[in-house]
Amino acid sequence: MPILAPLGPSPLSEVFTYSNLPSPVEMATGKDYRHSKAGILSKLPPSIKPYAELLRIHRPLGYYLNISPYVVGVAYTAAIAPVSLPATVLLNRLIILSLWGFLIRSGGCAWNDLIDMDIDRQVSRTKLRPLPRGAISPTSAALLTAIIFGCGGLLLLLLPSQCTVEAGIILFFALLYPFGKRFSDYPQLILVNIAWAIPMAMSSLEVDPLDFPYSTLSMCIFIASVIVMIDVVYACQDAEEDKKIGARSMAVRYSDITDQLAYGFFFSGAISLLLGGVLRGLGLPFIVFSVGGHIFGFLRFLSVTLGEGTKSASVESRAKSSCLLATVFWVLGFFLEYLARS
């Protein structure tokens, strides 16, 4: 069977579909789609492009959000560890955990699209994704998903055994996420599993997260708050169409107070980050750069994005630049603390 076979109904989508779906806004077909002539997708062979789209390699925001917590986790652990950690070990863990975050993001996108295929056909922003438009068969997508998660499992062999437990928690919630919108108004809260990157990074460096329970918890709340804040703002783009097809989310449930909700998560993140460092004795470099950079980057993101309206096409680009800027400042503050203690 050709790998790019035309789609029939997906067994997964038949089981996990809404019973009250209206007629599609416009059913997606391959002829509706034109590949972008710019960006990374334009440089790939035509046979590879649908798979690259499935993994969202042209949408780096998700990769930032999945990889940056591991980067922060390594930097934070270096700054608070009871003994000075060698730079070579830190670099090794940074590379392995970044690859793990990349694979979890990639596999999660493919899995999400497998489960949401029929729903994606109803939403204008997603109806031309590779699975809904028939560019990839469900079987091929499922096989690719399994291979990606398998590669992630192989990476765990390079880390201490405790990391396998933490990786299992992260993977479980990643697989659960696409079902959240069917059963709850709070699917974004499932994304807090990404915050488990902090204890996983600590364990990878053989620093027990339970030795510092309050600071570790604060850092997890910090990461979770940032992830949910960005996802709530981003989800507002689809809120109206989600209402029509019965999809549930915090953006739908709290559509009248999205601004207040987003700012609430922003302040939660800033306070938790501050506590996570102060409880471990981090000082001025951390407060000025890590906390100050967080406030500057994401306060600007919210003021501009919510000011323009959450349906603005610039939401993703604003989130991407803010996340990248904030990550640089987070790591810089921790790195300066690490140097001061070395």
Swiss-Prot record:
Listed PROSITE patterns: UBIA
Subcellular location as annotated: Membrane
Keyword Transferase: yes
Species for this entry: Aspergillus terreus (strain NIH 2624 / FGSC A1156)
Catalytic activity: 3,5-dimethylorsellinate + (2E,6E)-farnesyl diphosphate = (3R)-3-farnesyl-6-hydroxy-2,3,5-trimethyl-4-oxocyclohexa-1,5-diene-1-carboxylate + diphosphate + H(+)
EC code(s) of this entry: 2.5.1.-
Cofactor(s) for this UniProt protein: Mg(2+)
GO biological process, one term: terpenoid biosynthetic process
Protein name, UniProt field: Polyprenyl transferase trt2
Major subcellular location class: membrane
Enzyme class: transferase
Residue intervals passing through the bilayer: 71-91, 95-115, 141-161, 163-183, 187-207, 216-236, 261-278, 282-304, 319-339
Gene deletion effect: Impairs the synthesis of terretonin but accumulates 3,5-dimethylorsellinic acid (DMOA).
Entry's Gene Ontology molecular function annotations: 4-hydroxybenzoate polyprenyltransferase activity
